Amino acid sequence: MFNQKNVAFVITDPQVEFLKSTGKGFGATKDVLEKVNTIENLTKLLALAKERGYKRFISPHYFYPHDHKWQFKAAGETMMIENEMFWRDSQYSAIPEGSGADMIEEIKPFLDEDTIVVNGHKIFGPESNDLNLQLRKNGIDTVILAGMNANLCVDSHMRELIELGYNVIVVNDAVGAPGEEAYQAA
C-alpha cells in the first residue's frame, strides 16, 4: 500500500499546447487523448492525490526568447522553439492565461500550496530542471507518473527517475501521445 510520506504524483506537461484544441501540438495528440480519455483520467488522478494527501509535482515545459540563441538544438527543440510552443515572453512574467504554456483549466483546482511546480524542462527529461532535488528534499522514493507525451517526456522522466533510484509507476490512461503508434511504443 502507498503512503503519503514517500509517494508522490508527478505530471509532465499538463499544458494547453498538447491538451487543448488551441494548442500547437493538439493535432498530433487529439486521437489518443480521446481514445484513452486522458484529460478526465488526469483530472481524476490529481483529485485522488489531493484528497488522499499525496504531494503533487508538475514538471512543465517552457521556452523563452533566450532559448532562440542556443548554439545547437535537437530536432524536437528546434521544432518547438521555431513554432513558439510552450512559449513564455520571460521567466519573470506571468504565463498568459490560455496560452500554450498555461496549465489546462481542468487541473487548476489541484494546483495549490501542496503542489510543487518545478522549473521547466526543455527536452525531454528532468535532467534540466529541479524535479529530482524537489523529490529528494520531500522524502519521495516512489513516483506515480502521468502526463504528456507518453513516448517523449513521460518516457524520459520515467527512465531518468529509475536511473536515479526511484520506484516509478506510469498511469497509462492518464497520458497522451502524438498518435497510436507513439502511445503503444511507450
Where are these regions (language model features)?
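Active-site-adjacent betaalpha module
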Residues: 1-8, 17-18, 35, 44-52, ...
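Short hydrophobic beta-strand that contains or immediately precedes a catalytic carboxylate
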Residues: 10-12
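Acidic carboxylate-rich catalytic motifs and surrounding loops in phosphoryl-/glycosyl-chemistry enzymes
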Residues: 60-62, 121-122
